[in-house]
Amino acid sequence: LFCPTDTAMKNLKAEGFPFSLTNNHQQLITNVGDVMQDGAMFYKSLAKIPEAVSSLWSLVSGEDSKKQNLQTINQKPKTKNYILCTIHRAENTDDETRLRSIFDALNEIAKEKQIILPLHPRTKKLLENLQTKNQKLLTKNLTIIDPVGYLEMVWLIDNCDLVMTDSGGLQKEAYFFEKQCITLRDETEWVELV
């Protein structure tokens, strides 16, 4: 078996899985590292700024994004520090009180620092339902964009100051890119990150 972490190896040992065959000492389990990290680092050089973010920042800075070349756009903006946030898990979105609490906190944080939130379709639908109940959850300080592809997400992670998420994968990617991460869950499957 190929394991991504020492913790995974310890878990298999605790479950009684043999590390080697007793006859010839052939190793059955080995830590090969995390292929998710390999992928993230490989695609980092191919990452691109999401069009919605590029357009937003060009409006803020007065620049015409159509006149900028990709090399300029893909550089980390010096004055455009932001928090990257994603929310999609049922434990956070199915409970109206919890969802409202999360967005109240995000709106408060957004008064001091820009938050970019690629909004999952499921979360968007639930927010729209709450908005129709006259429960305003979104303010102008919170930058909502449509979901982005992997290369755009890699760019957002690489260029942010902080990650806030309930996504298991994004927690790990934040670690790979040496970003602090606030996990918006009661527990995580990635105990190595805590």
Predicted features by range, described:
Residues 48-56, 62-69, 78-159:
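Donor-nucleotide binding loops and adjacent catalytic segments primarily
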Residues 2-70, 80-95:
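A nucleotide-sugar donor-handling region in carbohydrate enzymes
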Residues 1-5, 12, 115-117, 163-164:
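A short beta-strand/loop micro-motif in the catalytic core of glycosyltransferases
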Residues 13-14, 97-98, 128-131, 175-178, ...:
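Short amphipathic alpha-helical segments
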Residues 4, 32, 86, 118, ...:
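Generic beta-sheet signal
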Residues 156-193:
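A donor-sugar binding/catalytic signature common to diverse glycosyltransferases
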